[in-house]
Every structure is written in C-alpha cells, then in structure tokens.
Amino acid sequence: MGPIRIGVGGPVGAGKTQLVERITRALIDEVSMAAITNDIYTIEDAKILAANGVLPEERIVGIETGGCPHTAIREDTSMNDAAIKDLVERFPDLELIFVESGGDNLSATFSPELVDFSIYIIDVAQGEKIPRKAGQGMIKSDLFIINKTDLAPYVGANLDVMVEDAKAFRKNKPFCLTNLRTDDGLDKVLEWIRHEVMMQDLQEA
C-alpha cells in the first residue's frame, strides 16, 4: 500500500501553496510527506514551497503542464503519476503526498485514480457569491476551505452568508474557514487530515 495522496485545488491566488506549506510545517514531526505542484509554464509554486516550507527540496516536484491546468489532474494524469512513482521510489517511507493543481476555475476536479482525497480552497476576496455558484470543485471535494477571512470587511463580503451557502451545497460534507496568514482555522484542517485521511482514531484503537 502506497502513500495517501491529497489533491489541493482552487483558483489562482486562493492559497493552495500556502495551505500545503502550513500543513506540512504542522505535521513534519508526525508524517513522512512530499509535494507535487502543477503550473502551466513555470515551477514557481515548487520554488516557493521549497524556500518557505519545511520539506526538503528533494521531496518537492514541480511540473510544467504546458496546457490547461485541470487536464493534468483529470484527463491526462501521466505527468503526476510519473512524479508520484519517482517520489515513492526515492522515499519508500512516504505516507502522504500533496498534489497541488495549477490555478483553475470552479469546475476543476481531480481524477479519483490520481488522488485519494481532495481539498478545494477559495478566498473571500473572490466575492461573497462564490460559494453560491457551487462549482464541481467545491461540491465534490472532501474538504472545502474558505480562506482569507480577514479580508471580508475590506471587500464587503459577509462570512455568515458564505457559510450558509456552503452548508447548502456541501450537505454533510466538511468545510471550514481559515486565515492561513495567521493559521486561524488551520487546526480544523489538521484535524480532518489526522482523523479522516490518516485515520489516527483507528490506529490508536
């Protein structure tokens, strides 16, 4: 059984790379991890993760997709598949791999053959009505995150409205609010990973 793979999707600037950086920083002493970033023409996100995060550079792979970002995570996952295979061969102890998509629209989803779980993140600055649009990325993800809550007063967004809209389309699926700049709400994300993804409750039983 190989490492668990978590897809991280969302629009440009929503906080995908920062989310991976914050999670890996918090779990570095608990879990053996690696990360893969996807972008169209650069590996800038991989460089940022290596410079600002705690993962060794050799555990971070940047992929230049050269086309539509969601193709590499859904229709043709071959580049990501190869990156995962390479990481597993180099680090047999891997328990968790994050696959960050390139910035994409609200309909982007991960192939179930590529990842085991997925997170979709948006930010408040994109507008109060974004959750109401209920794109497939927000609906189908295992965890939905509304990030940059601190910006709500400055962009005229009502967080209560966003929460109610999220409840309506998420039904019983989890979602949370975060301000990753200050780690506010990160505890909810970590709790989800520990208990829903890593299933620590079962391991400790």
Curated annotation (Swiss-Prot):
GO cellular component term, pick one = cytoplasm
Q: Where is the signal peptide?
A: none
Q: Which Pfam families match?
A: cobW
What does the UniProt entry say about where the protein is found?
Cytoplasm
Give the induction annotation: By urea and nitrogen starvation.
Which GO BP terms apply?
A: urea catabolic process
Q: Which UniProt keywords apply?
A: Chaperone, Cytoplasm, GTP-binding, Nickel insertion, Nucleotide-binding
Q: Where does GTP bind?
A: G10, P11, V12, G13, A14, G15, K16, T17
The Swiss-Prot or TrEMBL record annotates one GO molecular function as: GTP binding
Report the main location listed first in the record.
cytoplasm
| Subunit-structure text | Homodimer. UreD, UreF and UreG form a complex that acts as a GTP-hydrolysis-dependent molecular chaperone, activating the urease apoprotein by helping to assemble the nickel containing metallocenter of UreC. The UreE protein probably delivers the nickel.
Assigned protein family: Belongs to the SIMIBI class G3E GTPase family. UreG subfamily.
Q: What does this protein do?
A: Facilitates the functional incorporation of the urease nickel metallocenter. This process requires GTP hydrolysis, probably effectuated by UreG.
- What is the name of this protein? Urease accessory protein UreG
Instruction: Name the gene behind this protein.
Output: ureG
